Amino acid sequence: MEIRVANKYALGKKLGSGSFGDIYVAKDIVTMEEFAVKLESTRSKHPQLLYESKLYKILGGGIGVPKVYWYGIEGDFTIMVLDLLGPSLEDLFTLCNRKFSLKTVLMTADQMLNRIEYVHSKNFIHRDIKPDNFLIGRGKKVTLIHIIDFGLAKKYRDSRSHTHIPYKEGKNLTGTARYASINTHLGIEQSRRDDIEALGYVLMYFLRGSLPWQGLKAISKKDKYDKIMEKKISTSVEVLCRNASFEFVTYLNYCRSLRFEDRPDYTYLRRLLKDLFIREGFTYDFLFDWTCVYASEKDKKKMLENKNRFDQTADQEGRDQRNN
């Protein structure tokens, strides 16, 4: 028997599940367009779908932010219908044998920084920056990286006055320990700087294949968090970025130098990584490591056409320079 949501969407296969509930694919019964549907039990002890739907509404219209098409309660479930996206960067990382090239890391970093800056501009911090929460799109948006999962997001300043939340200590760790900033481990209230620092660890994870504080043995969750914190604090930025370009050292040192209420200089960070991109002679052609592995034949063809166009332009520029 076909299950329908809002008498408009036919529920299909299950895509996954999380602490909040389950995610399904659904089709519009008229247009046959596919969507993602999040289901959360109305009896959930820690409901987050209502909060998340409000966040999506606030962030609505932003590049790389999924659009919500319907939210409501039906039967025993709170339901949210939103854009169906492609795999996460974590999925693609696994697909690429758990190592990304420098070019792919820099192209993803550029987009991820843009997404984080946009969320911050709307007065919220994400508080769970990790590869699983960045997804590529589908079809025409296959090269666009989206930011998702705002269940842990928090307002860090007043919308009108821009008064920042107060500095606090003794907070429990919110987010994912692997990528959490050192200040988050120390129990300090999170602010913009922590999202940016977490991104730095994500980038090093992509470049190295793993982080030094992964796979630590522990007897409890608290013990594991403590061991991750100890290892993170004792591993210098220089050691963490040993085989990487100095720009990554600069990036992380900058993040750690920020004060609680500071607005990160997103433009400076983008320029820092863009300069490295240019110095390496890369072309921003949206050909990621996963492109040929994941993309459909149609998408592949489109990307190769783009690459040929870029190559022809580069060849022409080279000829022009030689002729001058």
From Swiss-Prot:
Annotated catalysed reactions: L-seryl-[protein] + ATP = O-phospho-L-seryl-[protein] + ADP + H(+); L-threonyl-[protein] + ATP = O-phospho-L-threonyl-[protein] + ADP + H(+)
InterPro entries registered for this protein in UniProt: CK1_Ser-Thr_kinase, Kinase-like_dom_sf, Prot_kinase_dom, Protein_kinase_ATP_BS, Ser/Thr_kinase_AS
BP GO annotations: peptidyl-serine phosphorylation; peptidyl-threonine phosphorylation
Catalytic residues identified in the record: D128
Keyword Flavoprotein: no
Protein kinase domain span: 9-278
Domain of life: Eukaryota
EC number(s) recorded for this UniProt protein: 2.7.11.1
Cellular compartments annotated: Cytoplasm; Cytoplasmic vesicle, Secretory vesicle, Microneme; Secreted; Host cell surface
One Pfam family of this chain: Pkinase
Cofactor(s) required for function per UniProt: Mg(2+)
Sections of the chain in a coiled coil: none
The keyword RNA-binding appears for this protein: no
Gene Ontology terms, MF aspect: ATP binding; metal ion binding; protein serine kinase activity; protein serine/threonine kinase activity
Subunit description: Interacts with rhoptry protein RON3; the interaction is direct. Interacts with CK2alpha; the interaction is direct. Interacts with nucleosome assembly protein NAPL. Interacts with RAB5b. Interacts with host GAPVD1. Interacts with host SNX22.
Family per similarity comment: Belongs to the protein kinase superfamily. CK1 Ser/Thr protein kinase family. Casein kinase I subfamily.
Protein name (record): Casein kinase I
Organism from which the protein derives: Plasmodium falciparum (isolate 3D7)
